[in-house]
């Protein structure tokens, strides 16, 4: 169920905060996704956009880890059984049909979550290097410690 807030109320609340994080589209608990035609829903006043993905997806078939699989396969030009590589993840995040969709002139960054072990950190570092070298996109690795997870 969606909850809607009037634009005037949202603007008032946002004016009271230093930073406001809004989820523009969800991934139905999948670690990566491609946006639907109507996504993302960005406010005109948004000045920074973050595209997030979970590193648990790397090395696994797209069909097992990607929300909106058909859109992702079309964007990446690969079949559903293709394992997600750092290069494919970087392309998915940096593409203007993917994570960078509708960003325009806003600042854009990639956030790679679930860097929970050495293998995932290595995949994340490789993805970040490809993002920087190929797409001029800056990003970061994140993870939660056991006590921090919901």
Write out the residue ranges for each language-model feature:
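General beta-strand structural signal in soluble alpha/beta enzymes
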Residues: 20-24, 51, 141
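Hydrophobic anchor at the start of a short beta-strand
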Residues: 19-20, 108, 137-139
